[in-house]
């Protein structure tokens, strides 16, 4: 779940490498609507796995044992991030380039933790399982040694993942 909104379609046209975004709808640090949801329309050759209720900290490998009994671990994440940010994150993105390079800072996009995290988030163990299956299936669908392996992995990513996990959806 990364900040996509500062990079325009022009930025992504420099490469035709397949792209998979995996974002959670309850991510308080990186707003889903302005970062995850825009991936398929903004990036050519991109797909999106959405985890309903997925939090930002739920993507961490340590999330399941540590945050298992929390309602939404992003409440801790926001406190930690906001305590070390001085004036925001714009300077980081400016270093990637200018508008002509496809980097555009939109002042209307919510900043990190601008919206309080919802009380409930997906279970971090399930979120981790979805993440690991999606990443493996994506890599196998692109780099699998044979067409049957690539095809089976693509089906796992596009169809089976959502069938196995009700909180997961795939968008091409």
What are these regions (language model features)?
Residues 53-55, 61-172:
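Alpha/beta-hydrolase-fold serine-hydrolase catalytic core, especially in secreted/extracellular enzymes
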């Amino acid at each position: 779940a990364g900040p996509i909104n500062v990079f325009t379609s022009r930025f992504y046209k420099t490469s035709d490498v397949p792209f998979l975004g995996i974002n959670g709808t309850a991510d308080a640090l990186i707003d889903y609507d302005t970062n995850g949801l825009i991936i398929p329309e903004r990036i050519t050759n991109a797909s999106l796995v959405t985890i309903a209720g997925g939090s930002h900290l739920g993507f961490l490998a340590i999330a399941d044992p540590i945050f298992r009994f929390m309602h939404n671990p992003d409440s801790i994440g926001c406190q930690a991030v906001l305590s070390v940010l001085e004036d925001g994150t714009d300077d980081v993105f400016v270093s990637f380039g200018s508008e002509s390079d496809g980097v555009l800072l939109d002042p209307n996009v919510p900043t990190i933790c601008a919206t309080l995290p919802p009380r409930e988030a997906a279970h971090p163990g399930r979120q981790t399982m979805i993440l690991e299956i999606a990443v493996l299936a994506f890599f196998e669908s692109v780099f699998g040694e044979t067409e049957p392996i690539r095809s089976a992995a693509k089906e796992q990513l596009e169809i089976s993942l959502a069938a196995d996990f009700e909180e997961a959806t795939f968008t091409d």
